Curated annotation (Swiss-Prot):
Record keywords, A-Z: Cytoplasm, Lipopolysaccharide biosynthesis, Transferase
Keyword Cytoplasm: yes
GO cellular component: cytoplasm
Record has Ligase as a keyword: no
Species the sequence originates in: Shewanella woodyi (strain ATCC 51908 / MS32)
Catalyses which reaction(s): D-arabinose 5-phosphate + phosphoenolpyruvate + H2O = 3-deoxy-alpha-D-manno-2-octulosonate-8-phosphate + phosphate
Pfam family, one: DAHP_synth_1
EC number: 2.5.1.55
Protein's recorded name: 2-dehydro-3-deoxyphosphooctonate aldolase
Molecular function GO terms recorded: 3-deoxy-8-phosphooctulonate synthase activity
Localization per Swiss-Prot or TrEMBL: Cytoplasm
Pathway field: Carbohydrate biosynthesis; 3-deoxy-D-manno-octulosonate biosynthesis; 3-deoxy-D-manno-octulosonate from D-ribulose 5-phosphate: step 2/3; Bacterial outer membrane biogenesis; lipopolysaccharide biosynthesis
InterPro entries xref list: Aldolase_TIM, DAHP1/KDSA, KDO8P_synthase
GO biological process, one term: keto-3-deoxy-D-manno-octulosonic acid biosynthetic process
Amino acid sequence: MSNKTIGLGSIEIANDKPFVLFGGMNVLESRDLAMKIAETYAETTQKLGIPYVFKASFDKANRSSVNSYRGPGMEEGLKIFEEIKSTFNLPLITDVHEIHQCAPVAEVVDIIQLPAFLARQTDLVVAMAKTGAIINVKKPQFLAPHEMRHIITKFNEAGNDEIILCERGSSFGYNNLVVDMLGMDEMKQTGYPVIFDATHALQRPGGRADSAGGRRAQATELARSGMALGLAGLFIEAHPDPDNAKCDGPCALPLHQLEAYLTQMKAVDDLVKSFDAIDTSK
């Protein structure tokens, strides 16, 4: 098996390269907050020498309640993304939910994300593929790791081979997710880069009746475990005031802890990738 390397400017995304951080906030709450969070991530990752891609959503289209905050929408969201990109010279990742969003979003961001709940929607997959952008595929909570090959094939047949696979937990009964560490290793066997969404994997879906709950107190332990697999990247969301975040606050890392958190993740990644491979199948 060979590891595929995806190039994003000077950044190399691959399972055998130093990890790349996809990080930011869950949903754009305001222009000022987005700029503050982007600046904190940019300064921290530059200090630690971690390749970095800024992440936020312009629309959370799958909230538990119709009354929940969704975001500023695509038009306003893309304006904020353009300002972040030009101000901090950062590559960007965001998610799309509808076919008509793919082309305009691809003009601004560098990586388009396929949401887990929509990962089998063929028309959306084809529209995303045709943009030529790098694609981050969230593994659905209801799919086995080996089933990701079918989604890869759809993108390939639509003309796109720039694919990243993202683990975000698997359904475990009602209102609970667990992370299958061997499943992430199984996805690595495809050769495509695998990243670990360590904050969404902390969710308790529907755990607060009209929104998702979470287990923020275990954010470090879960991320350390994932990084021990030797992955292409880590996906996290942070907020300066998680208890008052407009979406997924129970899973968000407190922003003031970002440097300490990433220092540990980089140490684990550096250590694991310094080891020689051991083939225990023989």
